[in-house]
Regions:
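ABC ATP-binding cassette signature C-motif
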Residues: 1-174
Length: 174
């Protein structure tokens, strides 16, 4: 069963066509990696798959009740917040009843232990790990990850690779 279908997609920015008649189907439990040179529409395809952008033509549909979590290439945060204030905002948006325990566990696993630290003080790798914690602590059917290992050290990239191999949901990543 297709969880996600992108059919005959066209997407252009000003006069530059990035996707022209592209089709993509993702089934339950399928893991797909997208490769290509810079500027060829990989990130655009992920944003379309995550429902963050609309195609110029074609259709993007997901199966009923499918939840998609998206990790952008460069996550954005409110730099005036502490790590924990940011996580609390995400917890308050969730319907899960025990998100606080799950969040603290995921943050520890990813090496984020100074919860009172301002986000503005985090390194690029710490920011990426915070963004990963944010999406991995919430249940979903499909993970859409745009260059999830950039800014991560070797050990954390290896941990993420192992986590994604064991993860039972569907995955699209660049």
């Amino acid at each position: 069963m297709n969880l996600l279908s992108l059919e005959n997609i066209t997407k252009a920015y000003t006069e530059r066509v990035l996707l022209d008649g592209a089709s993509f189907f993702l089934q339950e439990g399928e893991k797909v990696g997208i490769i290509g040179i810079n500027g060829t529409g990989k990130s655009t395809l992920l944003k379309l798959a995550a429902g963050l952008e609309e195609p110029d033509t074609g259709s993007c549909t997901k199966a009923n009740h499918v939840v998609i979590r998206y990790l952008p290439q460069t996550p954005e945060f409110d730099d005036s917040c502490t790590v924990w204030e940011h996580v609390e905002k995400k917890i308050s948006e969730s319907t899960q009843w025990d998100m606080e325990g799950e969040a603290k566990s995921m943050l520890r696993t990813l090496g984020i232990v100074r919860l009172e630290q301002k986000i503005s003080e985090l390194s690029g790798g710490q920011r990426k790990r915070l963004a990963l914690a944010e999406i991995l602590m919430q249940p979903c059917d499909i993970l859409v990850l745009d260059e999830p290992t950039n800014h991560l050290d070797h050990a954390m990239a290896a941990w993420l690779e192992d986590y994604l191999k064991r993860w039972r949901g569907s995955l699209i990543m660049v």
